């Protein structure tokens, strides 16, 4: 018997190495078609989900101030209650589990954890307890917590005191906030994001003024209460990058986070030329990608801004000191990507130099259709995002080719349905367009991984629930669960819920059918069973075939094979060698 064990040990060691090194099968479109340990999750943010804005010691954030002071800019709606995740998180985590999701990406409210924004004024114990309870509930349900430090909602007090991200003071306050998070939650949270979508924060917050803090030049938007669209986007972005680097420094010093990973999340669209025959439009595409991606990716990888951004912005783009550059370089363990849609780009002449602003510095204009009136995909006519799944694959290949194939996670991907009050609940629940959107994007993601070699390791759906969508209020719905805002915020599954359940349901399927397991429940002392099992393993070693290829063979062929070689493939798994490999 000792020899039997020795032979099996050698064979299974060899086979395990071969099986686990096999690539996923691109012909299989479910969880099995993605690499081992690929993470599927849903995503949310504190302000859009939690509610309870005046409970638990929380102070007003910039979005509380923005939505209450200028309600006309958020459709006369606010997130005081949002979807009440603060009180209902346990039930919502059950929904995640029922969806067969692996992870949940959420953000921590700086204003809830440190109400004044400054550690010297004290950490809010109730805030710490809430997030610890949330994390514990996730872990207890087998859901991996993925925490974002900043998703657009710093305390309004920092805005009042020194102008928020327009001041370098915020870098050290963000460092302190991050340190508290790592010390309090780092033992159970291993996936961290520093800043969510710095491009959106700076452009929408400081150029167009559509989002908090709502600043811009008066000639851009008369509703803005102050600002300079030509300089402030670059200044705020600069401090966001330095805040990211400061947080990463603290992360890498903290003992509790040594086995974790941290990165930044960017939000690129994909771009194609408005007129593919126009050299100017093709050059405009390069500038668009430089502003959407390279502007923030170059610093966290190389330690400096890309040359194109320096050329476009001139002396309005701040520069990094040597120490800052060193701090920024290689400051992301992974790159998070939020991808939603694509646009055509047309070159435009240089704008009036007397009225500089970020969106015209780059001499381009986004278009929904190209010069032939062709659009990327369905959606815009329904008030929802255009679906262009090929753009996701192209974004990933752009990053792979330009930045030496870094680790990437898709941190958000989803599509909205515009709810103007005229649609019935049944219409909204029947979200076949959302099913198609996710299916198409996951197929392109699978191709990017398997065929192109992009190192992508996770995909997060935006979002689990309908929620407060910033300046759009509650008029646009991204959730796979419908939230009935008129009926106690009841969660109702849309059709996409069943699609995701089925897509992810194969997580724990065994590699072979073990319905006859008891029939072949032999011991190593049974020589006949032992020889049959070794024969099965040797057969797999020499043929190197997958489960699915086996199942496609004619069943009578297996019968002949068993007759000729004594192979009992059904008994293969009775020893449990390859449980849950895929």
Swiss-Prot record:
- Molecular function as annotated in GO: beta-glucosidase activity
Glycosylated residues: list them. Answer: 255, 330, 370, 430, 521, 544
Signal sequence coordinates: 1-21
Enzyme Commission number, as recorded = 3.2.1.21
- Covalent S-S links between cysteines: 216-224
The reaction(s) annotated as catalysed by this protein in its Swiss-Prot or TrEMBL entry are:
Hydrolysis of terminal, non-reducing beta-D-glucosyl residues with release of beta-D-glucose
Would I find Glycoprotein among this entry's keywords?
yes
Pfam families in UniProt? Glyco_hydro_1
Keywords of the record, alphabetical order, are: Disulfide bond, Glycoprotein, Glycosidase, Hydrolase, Signal
- Family according to the record: Belongs to the glycosyl hydrolase 1 family.
What is this protein's name? Beta-glucosidase 28
Q: Which organism is it from?
A: Arabidopsis thaliana (Mouse-ear cress)
Q: Gene name on record?
A: BGLU28
